[in-house]
Amino acid sequence: MPNEAPKSKILSYRRSHFVTRLPVGFLYSPSHCWLQRCNDEGLWRVGITKFASRMLGEMVDFGFELKPADPAKTGQIIGWLEGFKAISDVYCVVEGAFAGSNPALEKKIGFIDKDPYQKGWLYEATGEPDPKCMNVDDYVTVLDKTIDKILENQSADEIN
């Protein structure tokens, strides 16, 4: 099992003031997680997208409620992330078993912000991805709609 995800093709994305690079071969959840298949036995590495980390702000703490080999269901709260802007539950996006959290984050939680698609992964799980997960092109559509809604709300707040 690799310590870092292999280099993959990248899609450059820009909408309003948000710019990111999205690995093409990953799956993405509507809740702004990414999934990368690690092997043919159904091991998936999971992290949050640059968009999600930006919404939470600089990471300050995290924790997981499951131990390796514990069963995990899609949609189940398995942990939490705390950023300067917000605290968020971490939901499982793989139906199967929790394989463990990223040990590198214990020493450098900033990997979540600075290198979300390589060193900043959150956890690994074996099983099947949530059927709501999508390819990068479909995720771009989700990002567009999400950012447009944020901009719409900001405009409404400025008017009021």
Predicted regions span which residues?
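Flexible, gly/ser-rich surface segments that form the specificity/activation loops bordering the active-site cleft
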Residues: 81-83
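Non-catalytic terminal segments and appended small domains
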Residues: 1-77, 88, 97-160
